[in-house]
Amino acid sequence: MDLEIRLDTPGTLSKKIPFCLGLQITSLKITGFLNRQDFDDVLDDICSSMGTYDDDDNYILDLDQSPSLRCLDMGEAIFVDGEELPFFGFHTQLETLILPKGISSIFESGEHDTGFSGSEMLKKLVLPEGIKILDGLHDCPNLKEVKLPESVECIESYTFAGCTSIEKIRIPKNVSYFDGSSFADCHISRFELDSDNPNFKEIDGVIYSKDLSRLIAFPSYYPHANFAIPPTTRIIGCGAFMDSRIDSIEIPESVEEIEEEAFQGSEIKSIAISDSVKKIGKLAFRFCRNLESIKLSGSISKIPEQLFSSCHSLKKIGIPSNIKRIEYTALAWCGGLEEIIFHSGVEEVTPSGPLLIRTSHLKRVVIPDTLKSLPGGAFSYSGNPDVFELDSRNPYFSLRDGILYSKDGTRIISVPNRNRVRFDVPAGVTVISEMVFLDMVNLEEVTLPATLKTIESRAFQGCNSLQSITIPASVTHVDINALWADNLEDVYLGCSIPPTMTGPISQKDWRYRNVRLHVPRESVTDYRNSPGWQCFDITPL
């Protein structure tokens, strides 16, 4: 059913479109005046699809259960209730959406998205003249027709990312901000730029700052396999090459900085970063699935978080001596990585989260004499029990039967090969570092020495074959997350005085309510009143 309505009084749409009627309308044109109440009472309902989420958190649209509306035309209406378009719709089933006049932003403050992001059906979007800020239109794979009004000043990051049917875009003259992620993965072979825009310059379909010192945005479907960055470029901007289909990029000596997400998701196979580059932002090469080799700049001192995460084709990487610090997650999810060489000069691998790799080809990790800090559980996902090669001059670590310890042997740091069924922590160890046994799903039995004092965070998390563990009376500190193993049934603890529980403690922790904690009979009351331990099912030994 097609319907055309004029509203002389804002807030009265519900009187003209009862709920049952609204679900039957296929095309709706509204003229006159709209306010927030009209969106909340009517438009939100008739523009929201019905569906479910699959196991991968993808939204599956159910057209049989969704409203019938496919075209909503508000182009001759005026929104009179502020300048921000209210949030309405959810994974909208609309195919054509024409927004009203009177708005300067389609993104409502306090919301994380718009109701029409992630819409698989939206094909045409008409934005009103007067709109200044664009955001939240990402992941609409069939959106093809969109024209940016001359009034647009800002196109936020990721605004049209994943709108894979957009083939042509023209940046209006008043735009002062956008970046490469704004149109990431759009089917654009070249950007068009209004010649009167005072902020940007277009050369061969690529957008630069007006003075050519910053490369702003590279089209995802650039028609050539190779690209040489111009020698005027000093900064490769945030998300500049995101999701670009290009094999190789030449970086000139003029480039001093590569900002975060600059090459994320691009199809580059190799890259050499010149020594002129002094800073690289986080996530700069994340999801570069074809990246096989990389030469790092000799002028940077830090590798930030997730710099190469999910680079599945990367098999070998050498961290040069000029790098003093590398975030552990810089190499997260690199399942194809076989060899990591830390050259002499590297001092620190900082704990910024686990690598989250369940299967791994990692065969070799070279630890130099200068490395003094590694997070607990580092590189333990390797199936090679002898993955570590330790420089004998290193004064901070020791290696025994392939297991990495502190130099004096009092702290156990990493136990490679997660296929172990049993492990005996040797006498002399006083600290089990964080995540040492993380996700050792086959581990059924572990023995702890009488010298042990501290069990750090997530030490046994994910050890789902572990049903029982005995903690010696020598232990004084246990992290609340240390014993998070789904099938753990019994914890035997011989301490008369409850060890101090560290970490984010709550009075009721669902993870431990069915875990029996066996403690000395005379200490049962103390444990039941002790923060953290009170979450267990406490019973006397």
Question: Across the structure, where does each feature detected by a protein language model lie?
Answer:
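Structural signature of tandem-repeat unit edges
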Residues: M1-T9, T26-L34, D55-G82, T92-S105, ...
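Surface-exposed ligand/attachment interfaces on beta-rich extracellular proteins
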Residues: D8-I17
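Leucine-rich repeat
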Residues: K16-L21, L43-G51, Y59-Q65, P86-F90, ...
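Extended Gly/Ser/Thr-rich low-complexity repeat segments
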Residues: D40-C47, N226-A228, G239, R422-D424, ...
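Helix-loop-beta element that forms the nucleotide-linked donor phosphate-binding surface
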Residues: S530-C535
